[in-house]
Amino acid sequence: MNYLAGVDEAGLGPILGPLVVGGVTMAGPEGTAPWRLLQSHVTKLKYKKGKVRVADSKKVKQGPHGFKRLEETALVFWTALHGEPPATLHEWLVALGHDLAPLQRCPWYENLDLELPRRADRDWICLTGELVARSLRQGGCELLDISVLAVDVEEWNVLIEDTDNKSKAHFHAYAEVLGHLLHGLFPRVGKDDACTLVADRCGGRMHYQMDLKRLCPDAFITVVEEIPGTSTYNLKQASRDITVTFAERAEDRAFPTALASCFAK
C-alpha cells in the first residue's frame, strides 16, 4: 500500500487573515495517480463542466465563478469521506474539532449558522461526492483524513506575542496539521508500504529537521536533501518510514497537497 499526504495553507499573504492550514491523507496501490484515477469527475489544469477542479486553490478560485468552484471541490471531497456535506458552517467547524468560542467573540464571525453550500448545488455535491468515493473504491484507494485548522485573530495574536516572529507563529500553526497527519500515518504504515507527505514550503525556510524532531520525538530523522526550492527528510520509527518533502509549488506535485490548499482557501 502507498500512503500520500499533503499540507498547505491560505491566508498568510500581504494582508493576513484568517490563516487556515489544510491537510489531506490518502492511500492506494503502488503507481496510483489520483488525478488519473478520478478523471471522470476531477480536472487539474482547467475547469470542465460537471467536474471539480483539484489544483492550486488560487487558480481554482479565479474568475467570477471561482468561489462556487472552490466550494464544490471542498464539499465534494468532504462528502466522499463523510457521506454528506455539512448543513451549516457551525456544523462543519464542530466536525473539524474547532473551539468556536474565540470565533464567536469576533463580530465578523457572529453568524456561524450560515447554510452550506453558499453557492454550489447541494444535490450535485452529494451525487458527485458519492461518485468520487465510488471511483476511489474501484481503484483500491481511500481518502483517509481531511484536517483543517483555522487560526483566528485572538489565537494569532497570542502566537505573535509568544514567538515575536511572524514566521515562527506561522509554522506553529502549520506544524499542528503536519503533526496530526504524521501521527495518524505512523500506526498505519507497514514495513513494505511507501509513505510520502508533500507540504508546501513555508516562506523562505529551508531547514526543517529540528521542527520535525519536535513533532516526532520518537522518530530518527535524516536529511535527504536541502536545496533551493525543496527540502526532503526521511522519518524512521521502528520499521516504518515516511518521506516528508517541503517544496515550492507543492500543489502541482501532489494531489493531496492541491486538495489541502482548496480546503484551506
Task: Give the location of each predicted region.
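RNase H-like, Mg2+-dependent phosphodiesterase core
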Residues: 1-265
